[in-house]
Amino acid sequence: VKRVVLIGAGHAHLVVLRSLAEKPLYNARIALVSPHAKQVYSGMLPGILAGHYRRAEAEVDIATLAERGQVEFVPGKVQRLDPDKKTVTLESGADSGYDLASINAGSLVGASLPGAERALPVKPYEEFLSRLRIPERVAIVGAGAAGAEIAMAVRHRGAQVTLYSENASISARVVRQLRRRKVDYRPGMPVTAIEPGPLVITGLARQEFDCVVLATGAAPLPWLRQSGLRTCARGFVLVDSTLRSVSHPEVFAAGDCATLADLPHPKSGVYAVRHGEALIENLRRRVAHADLEPYAPQEKALALITCGARYAIAEHGEWSAQGWWVWWWKDRIDRRWIRSFL
């Protein structure tokens, strides 16, 4: 009987757990390590912030889902992974050995600017939602679709919102919605420090806020960077087309924490879900000593971007659209995703 440890409960591992609930893997003893018994679905986070959903409507009960698939749920945070000794050590000091490990632990907000500890990082989502109280003046550092969605959601709740972006990585449609909803959008204006107050520093300018939210790009978890697994230049686990580590074949990785060596693609929930479908197939094959199936990511992914109110933008390659009907479409997709784990 093989010992399999699933580290983290991101999109890919949720797909794995759902598959195991439908068809358990009887010739393996499986454990899932996660700091939270319930996982907030990232696609519905802006809707929670805007007041359209209760948090409970956007959570997956991973402890119950694991139990249905005969997977042991182990609450805790990973402190160290030793892929040479095949052990996982938790912050509690507990050790667990494995024959196979799969990592889908997501990423952190990448912020190296001075004073970042005075800000509220958007990840992990569970801690972000528990700590956030929407005050009068909010600064959001880091654009991209995630930063824009959070800005418009918080603005919808009545706050004065300033969105700082070092580069213009969002579409003209999204920019128009930011302007329309009176978000103070400042592209090409990198934040150089966050001082007590908190004060946001951009060049020689200083502006005071009640809360600063960090929604900058993805950064790897420290224990993953220090694990000895081969990583890409940004510190994410390098995997081959079967989602196995290129340096340690007993380790799989998926979602934000992984980078495909030959076919790198953007880090988003859409790709992570596809990873999950390939991952469970290859975990079953690996336990059965069968050949693994290669995974090929799609060239383009659909992005559905909410705009605070019940209004959203759809983007897929060169095609885009917007309106209340896009929000309704996204709402149906998101609710169906949550229901699939009940």
How does the language model describe each region?
Residues 127-164:
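Rossmann-like NAD(P)H-binding beta-loop-alpha module
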Residues 72-81, 88, 96, 157-241:
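A Rossmann-like FAD-binding core segment of flavoenzymes
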Residues 309-342:
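C-terminal auxiliary extensions adjacent to catalytic cores
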Residues 2-72, 149-173:
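Beta1-alpha1 glycine-rich phosphate/pyrophosphate-binding loop at the start
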Residues 257-308:
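A conserved FAD-binding loop/helix module that cradles the flavin
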Residues 1-10, 136-144:
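Beta1/beta-strand and adjacent pyrophosphate-binding region of the FAD-binding site
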Residues 3-5, 68-137, 213:
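FAD-binding core/adjacent interface of flavoenzyme oxidoreductases
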